[in-house]
UniProtKB/Swiss-Prot annotation:
Disruption phenotype: Embryonic lethality when homozygous, due to embryo and endosperm developmental arrest at various stages ranging from the zygote stage to the globular stage. Failure in the fusion of the polar cells in embryo sac development.
Compositionally skewed regions (Acidic residues) per UniProt: 310-323
Protein's UniProt keywords contain Cytoplasm: yes
Pfam families assigned to the protein according to its UniProt record, in alphabetical order: WDR55
Free-text tissue specificity from the UniProt record: Highly expressed in roots. Expressed in cotyledons, leaves, buds and flowers.
Name the UniProt record assigns to this protein: WD repeat-containing protein 55
Sections of the chain in a coiled coil: none
Keywords from the named record: Cytoplasm, Developmental protein, Nucleus, Repeat, WD repeat
Amino acid sequence: MEIDLGANAFGIDFHPSTNLVAAGLIDGHLHLYRYDSDSSLVRERKVRAHKESCRAVRFIDDGQRIVTASADCSILATDVETGAQVAHLENAHEDAVNTLINVTETTIASGDDKGCVKIWDTRQRSCSHEFNAHEDYISGMTFASDSMKLVVTSGDGTLSVCNLRTSKVQSQSEFSEDELLSVVIMKNGRKVICGTQNGTLLLYSWGFFKDCSDRFVDLAPNSVDALLKLDEDRLITGCDNGIISLVGILPNRIIQPIGSHDYPIEDLALSHDKKFLGSTAHDSMLKLWNLEEILEGSNVNSGNASGAAEDSDSDNDGMDLDNDPSKSSKGSKRKTKSKANTLNATNNFFADL
């Protein structure tokens, strides 16, 4: 199932309970599509959300609203039913907003092209925390709710851990020779996986963020521009060669290809029932892949190790991380395009705005 959006999309997200998918485009438009198992995508709504590119998009408020982040430095909340503007943080950052994720029911986190991360308190309608650990654009963020820590990756080649309880940057990795482009937490919180520009996956153990404990090189030399966690042992990668793959972590191996685009992958997202994988790329196409059909039988093999992992980590207590070097795709993509991707929110962020 696929549709030509008419322009490149840099962020996508699925509705948390119904068959709707949203896409944020390079021209600032927000598109909303309905899908089902048997027919093509049908556009339900088109909204001019931003003056510049829409870099990130997520459903919040149980799917009642869509939040978008833009190169115009703003964050916008749009009503799903009417398409009306609900709230607008016009100058959320001093630079282009590149990433946005949900943190708690009353806070979200946003990251910009200069490396600044902000935590927004929706009740106070203000920025409650600000972290400036990075020297280049924020490429990805993920939140560890049990410890109230935000894990951040950047084009400067480092990963940081921001403690929301102490309002301090608790840890930061050594500088890598390569940009860190994407991040997920796996193995029940014991491992942090980062995608890099040269295609190496870096595995950090929780609590030991200075250096990586493992590296997986089978995707090289294609930069890993998008990472999506499928479960605690498997993730989905989107690379700049247009290939989408299912990858096992510890043991590290490429399990199987999922699909492809003609151009670099920009963003990946899972439907509410995990039946469909959504993907966007630099070919203006939005594609939905039926994971139930594609992955049938792959669970049986999820314990086999093939593939090349430079270090073999037993995944005991989990505590390392590492970066590899040598390419140029996500960082340059995010900043050059003046539109990037990734937004993650599941609560009532703009409820009080």
